[in-house]
Amino acid sequence: MTVTPSGSNGAGSAAPEGRKLLRLEVRNAQTPIERKPPWIKTRARMGPEYKELKSLVKREGLHTVCEEAGCPNIFECWEDREATFLIGGEQCTRRCDFCQIDTGKPSELDRDEPRRVAESVQAMGLRYSTVTGVARDDLPDGGAWLYAETVREIKRLNPNTGVELLIPDFNGDPALLAQVFESRPEVLAHNVETVPRIFKRIRPAFRYERSLAVLTAARDDNLVTKSNLILGMGETPDEVRTALVDLHEAGCDIITITQYLRPSPRHHPVERWVKPEEFVEFAQFAEGLGFAGVLSGPLVRSSYRAGRLYAQAARLKPAATPPVS
């Protein structure tokens, strides 16, 4: 998944509670937090829908990734009545070098979480909801039931709300993937995040080809598919274009392309700041390949304008039906 904050104040090189720093984290921390270029900025546009949701979330004690990850796009997404929820707990059984979610032993599975998320979607009056979560390799089903049940509960309470489900790879297990696909989210997302050459370094518990296979399986089940690429972690422009070709050939319908923002000193250093005009060029390349939906920019995140991208892709994929607005 893609969970990166809007930036870091430079703190955070200390080990997370309950474990020591990994050797990789110690090495990462030797590089100071990078100064962001002037184009990495966002304006707070607090419209009436945003203000209403902000008040409701605070009053009801609801939790969204939008707020907790400090997403720079919260103002736009909430104005569109879109939000993202994290399921499965606060500890992930895998560690990706860009992700702010901590690695450790997860808490027990909370079987009531799907209902609570669905009620939050209902309370917020969302038009489109994105659900993401941690990897749960500690569970026999890898958390497949939790992901599928959350979609079912959201749809039961909110029949006119679109649901985008961003999943781990479930180790490529066809039965577990089928269990998740049967919940029929409007969009099935699985993020590749980076290019083959540096994939193992950045995402050691995942496999590039396996991630592509997850998207192919979802495509074959007639789901609208989506993925994400994070730039600035050491890839070259040619490698980005090759990854886009791979994703399109694997059956990916929607692609988002983003700039890596380092969550803390113990995370992978920013190798370079990709210029806005480069993001435009990558978007044009992706559109030329035939992706049904493309968003590319320094502050784009994988769930940014998710409902709009789905509606755009659905028009080009007749089996998909956009949610009622």
From Swiss-Prot:
Cofactor details (free text): Binds 2 [4Fe-4S] clusters per subunit. One cluster is coordinated with 3 cysteines and an exchangeable S-adenosyl-L-methionine.
Cofactor entry: [4Fe-4S] cluster
Alphabetical UniProt keywords: 4Fe-4S, Cytoplasm, Iron, Iron-sulfur, Metal-binding, S-adenosyl-L-methionine, Transferase
Family annotation (InterPro entries): Aldolase_TIM (IPR013785), Elp3/MiaA/NifB-like_rSAM (IPR006638), LIAS_N (IPR031691), Lipoyl_synth (IPR003698), rSAM (IPR007197)
EC number: 2.8.1.8
GO MF term set: 4 iron, 4 sulfur cluster binding; lipoate synthase activity; metal ion binding
Name of the protein: Lipoyl synthase
Protein species of origin: Mycobacterium sp. (strain KMS)
Gene from which the chain derives: lipA
